[in-house]
């Protein structure tokens, strides 16, 4: 049977032009409407739509509120296109039009019938998902009913439900009374005669091995009975007396209060805890022991076998441990995916590098394990004791965007202090991202006695302030640093940072005042610097680097990086550090820093006294500029940028003394107006200095001696050189140049002696004598000549 609708078509809204798929005799027989499930609007030709062609119309109005456009042919049965009159000429065309109009009317009538409520192929009426309106109430069982009739029926059902609720409340009241009875043990159900009464019973004896103290609740065939009205119980005879006899087959259930619970043996067993809903089983006592301050993941279904995915169980345990301690069994390893700690709590386990570990599941097929293994979102402190969080050997991706961090704390954006986490004796190692991340603006975090190794990026990154990292072992980062600090007032002490791809410790700060302490740490065998510190600008900086040990840094490029690098800032304190080599021997192949201390961008220390070995501690020099103090095994250098000053109590006090070990007096002393020298057996007395009696002169205390050797120690006065000859009484001098031999100069003459008795009397060359008659000159040793004074 042809069931197609030919004269009506509906289009979804959205377009503006629509086709007319049927033929029509006149445009007035075509109706265009906007339609929705509960509304219809007939449009007017020309003002609300118009014909684009004979078979196409265009809408001129908005379709908001409607979801379909309907085009329907509705041919008038009374308004004939062709009207026949008696005696008129009958033409075939007119007959055709008249016949077509009749056919259209019939076709539209058939479509209307199909659209009203047609029959399906089985003869059933089909409302086609539309409402049937003005339906009378049903009478017979097979009649349809209308909504009013249904509402009335449901209202009656609601009354029945209300009665059921009343019974339920009554039942709860019984239970409450039952629970409030604190004089005995409660909660045992008893069924009479196997669930089927004989019939006619009004007295029922409860036959149980233990005494029943009360029967607070009875049901007969599901109907509750009121104690004192519909039944009574006599505890001495253990008898229930009913107001109405039981019928045959009645089901009577009583709830009793007794001195002995049938469940007691079950609950006391080794699996008794499973009877009260715990997932890990065990005894009830063990479950009670775990309920107090400690939470264990086994209570939530964790296996800890190193194979099963315990994510859901461990996360449930974390959620339940707010303000408590989550205890990880020291003998187990919990495989997990990403975990979140949303509140303050403590996690404790068996010890660093022992049991009780949280292990990332890692990549599985195409699924990449990335993000943060443990993310702390709590505003308060989260503390971990003896916890191992180890990703070494797990399948992880070392590609940016797909890396897995170990433990990360979210940044603090509240504008007030939020505490950082605290780690004690933990091990967090082996992640493809960062092992440990302290959130920005988080303060007072602690990492102590912890091992943190083998991250692919930096091992520890702290973005907050006032953190303390102590007695922690950090190393073997794949591409990053050991410890990276990005804010002020942090302290790293008693730590080892080793074998990192880049630097052992890095502190950089973009703005603000810098403050950082590095105390008693060992930084060795790092690819770049031992410690690198970059202040934002020249400022009084609170950088303290004290009592640390540096060796074999700059391994990625021997002699390029430095043990200590400081950029910008003044007032840095660098004291007591030791710079050494792993192989202190000639020809050693171990890497060394370019400088022990490298000062960049004008960085200036306030105090810098380090110990180093000139032969093995560096490749280039101790420091890149000669303005710092330095100590090695046998010298002490005071930087050229400083004036060495020693204050004394008076002008006669000694300021500096140089002693030989075991001697009581100095060999040399500075003070009391000069420099004095001695033998160590008495106070120094000879030397040079200043005396007010001889202004503008250097005074020799207790004499002045000059060796006077012509080739090593001539005595100079202005441009004159004076030295001793090779004979007694010979003294030579020369002006302008050093002598080339012992006699390369003029001989001082003018020694006056007693007149000789003869020409061979004793005398030295140059001696002169005079008496009343002669002038005597010793021209050679013991050889004299004389001339009469009268000849002059």
Swiss-Prot record:
Gene Ontology annotations of biological process type: adhesion receptor-mediated virion attachment to host cell; symbiont entry into host cell via disruption of host cell envelope; symbiont entry into host cell via disruption of host cell glycocalyx
Domain of life of the native organism: Viruses
Keywords assigned by UniProt, alphabetized: Degradation of host capsule during virus entry, Degradation of host cell envelope components during virus entry, Host-virus interaction, Lyase, Viral attachment to host adhesion receptor, Viral attachment to host cell, Viral tail protein, Virion, Virus entry into host cell
Gene Ontology terms for molecular function: lyase activity
Major site of localization recorded for this protein: virion
Keyword Lyase attributed: yes
GO cellular component: virus tail
Cellular compartments annotated: Virion
Keyword Lipid biosynthesis: no
Function recorded in the entry: Functions as a receptor binding protein (RBP) and probably mediates the attachment to the host capsular exopolysaccharides. Displays a depolymerase activity that specifically degrades the K30/K69-type polysaccharides of Klebsiella pneumoniae capsule, which allows the phage to reach the host cell membrane and bind the entry receptor.
Domains as described in the record: The N-terminus anchors the RBP to the virion. The central part and C-terminus probably binds and degrades the host exopolysaccharides.
Subunit structure: Interacts (via N-terminus) with depolymerase 2 (via N-terminus); this interaction probably gives rise to a branched tailspike.
Family recorded in the similarity comment: In the N-terminal section; belongs to the Teseptimavirus fiber family. In the C-terminal section; belongs to the K30/K69-specific depolymerase family.
Descriptive protein name: Depolymerase 1, capsule K30/K69-specific
